[in-house]
Regions:
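Hydrophobic alpha-helical segments and helix pairs
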Residues: 129-161, 165-166
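Alpha-helix N-cap/helix-start motif at helix boundaries, enriched for small hydrophobics
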Residues: 97, 159, 258-259
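The feature captures the transmembrane alpha-helix scaffold of multi-pass secondary transporters
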Residues: 144, 148-149, 177, 181, ...
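N-terminal, membrane-interfacial amphipathic/helix-forming hydrophobic leader that caps
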Residues: 1-94, 98-101, 105, 117, ...
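Membrane-interface helix/loop boundary segments of multi-pass membrane proteins
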Residues: 157-210, 250-254
Length: 321
């Protein structure tokens, strides 16, 4: 009886002291984001269409598809649940996650942005010269400010979540490389979850939007995993992106280089997509319908990482004790 009790107490103590519950809380966080996002999506859709009808300056909101409201709802849910996640993990400051203040943050953001955006535009120029992409008839110059705002918001939010909170927490449990690979894979999986772009059949299957429409759309976000070319060209590129961002974060003990890189990739992707269009439907495996998919983007991201780590300034801030 005494041995059994001692074993039970020891097991409980070991369980409480281990970091395994951290991983479970992170998994629960992502499940909760999917559930809350699906619940919020119809309300965002109704609110957006109402605002579009009530305010002429916001009329464009009535033309936004339910899929885009669904994506934004997931983003809202991720932000809303981030604070409870941090509290449950007993994270009080960035130093608890191995991050330190970076006095050279402007330099790191600027270099990361210029390198990522510059090489992505270089890839775009090659695709234009090769005839795989062409300039749009009506250039969407008005999309450029939106691309800049989106790049800033997405990079700060996602780097705070993935390379800040998640990578810092997983490193408590696993070694450096297992943690980096796990978070990079998670980053790629999350970005691979999106509804199909072919809206007509999808909207027909959904019918009129009701408060459970988000849950009806939720199973359809996994469609890209059934396409082997998309899985190879898209998922692998996203994985290398996530791995690069994670490695530079731990090398500098700061998020700013990763934020600059991420913002450069988002701005380059959205700008090129606004100004050009593919000349044919099937370009895989070399390139897809945007600069995120294909072996060409994969090589470009890998080259960006190699240049960054080779030439980056070595005077980086050190973590606090």
């Amino acid at each position: 009886m005494r041995k059994t009790l001692l074993f039970s107490v020891s097991s409980v103590t070991l369980w409480q002291n281990s970091r395994v519950p951290d991983i479970r809380r992170i998994a629960l966080y992502f499940v909760a984001v999917l559930g809350l996002g699906a619940l919020l999506a119809p309300w965002l859709y109704w609110g957006g269409t109402w605002l579009g009808g009530a305010m002429p300056s916001l009329e464009f909101l009535q033309r936004v598809t339910f899929q885009r409201y669904f994506n934004r709802a997931m983003l809202v849910a991720a932000v809303a649940l981030l604070w409870p996640l941090a509290k449950s993990l007993h994270v009080r400051s960035w130093s608890d996650l191995g991050l330190s203040p970076n006095p050279a943050w402007r330099r790191d953001v600027g270099l990361g942005f210029a390198l990522a955006c510059g090489l992505l535009f270089a890839l775009g120029a090659v695709l234009l010269v090769a005839g795989l992409y062409d300039w749009r008839q009506g250039l969407k110059w008005t999309d450029l400010p939106n691309a800049a705002v989106s790049a800033a918001a997405v990079s700060i939010l996602e780097e705070s979540l993935f390379r800040g909170a998640l990578l810092g927490v997983v490193l408590r449990t696993a070694g450096a490389w297992p943690a980096q690979n796990f978070v990079a894979a998670l980053f790629a999986i999350v970005h691979f979850l999106k509804p199909p772009e072919n809206t007509t059949p999808l909207l027909a299957s959904l019918g009129s939007i009701h408060w459970l429409s988000g849950f009806e759309l939720l199973p359809k976000v996994f469609w890209q995993f059934s396409d082997p070319w998309l899985l190879l060209g898209g998922f692998l590129t996203l994985f290398v992106v996530g791995l690069t961002l994670g490695l530079i974060t731990r090398a500098t003990h700061s998020l700013w280089s990763a934020i600059g890189l991420h913002a450069g990739w988002v701005f380059g992707l959205k700008t090129f997509s606004a100004l050009t269009a593919p000349t044919r439907a099937h370009l895989l495996p070399w390139v897809g319908q945007n600069l995120l998919i294909g072996l060409g983007p994969l090589v470009t991201v890998a080259l960006t990482a190699a240049i960054l780590f080779w030439f980056r300034p070595r005077e980086t801030p050190t973590p606090r004790a």
